A protein has these predicted regions:
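Sec-dependent N-terminal signal peptides
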Residues: 4-14
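Small beta-barrel nucleic-acid-binding modules, primarily SNase/OB-fold domains
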Residues: 17-133
Length: 133
């Protein structure tokens, strides 16, 4: 009986440590589709928006702040009027792209630092957002 217990524990240990063993691993989706009408809530800046992400627990997926990887934008909160004007135009263009999109997809999600938000590659109608912008 002791021998059976020892080998059972040894088997569980080896399977859990093995890179081949997938008994305890869970897979997660690598793409998330959003609807511009129902999921996108608001646009915060020229590269940041808030959306409800489906297939994620509501604690993490509802009203999630998403920053688009690769888009550099000016800050609206600046004293330089030309920079603020440029930031407003970037926000307006980004907002319109999201509103007019028929298909929005998030890929390569990465948790942001210093806050509850994520970085993502955002695809609009099959094209990565950086190429459209």
């Amino acid at each position: 009986m002791r021998r059976f217990g020892f080998f059972s524990i040894l088997f569980i240990f080896l399977v859990s440590c093995s890179s081949e063993g997938k008994f305890f691993r869970q897979s997660y989706p690598d793409k998330f589709k959003l609807s511009a009408e129902t999921d996108v809530m608001e646009t915060l800046s020229g590269n940041t928006f808030v959306a409800n992400v489906k297939n994620i627990h509501p604690v993490f997926g509802e009203a999630l702040t998403i920053k688009v990887r690769g888009l550099k934008v000016d800050s609206i909160e600046t004293e330089d009027s030309s920079s603020a004007s440029r930031a407003f135009r970037q926000w307006h263009k980004f907002s319109n792209l999201l509103k007019e999109a028929s298909d929005i997809e998030l890929r390569n999600l990465e948790r942001g630092r210093n806050g509850f938000w994520i970085w993502a590659d955002v695809y609009i109608d099959g094209e990565i957002l950086g190429d459209l912008y």
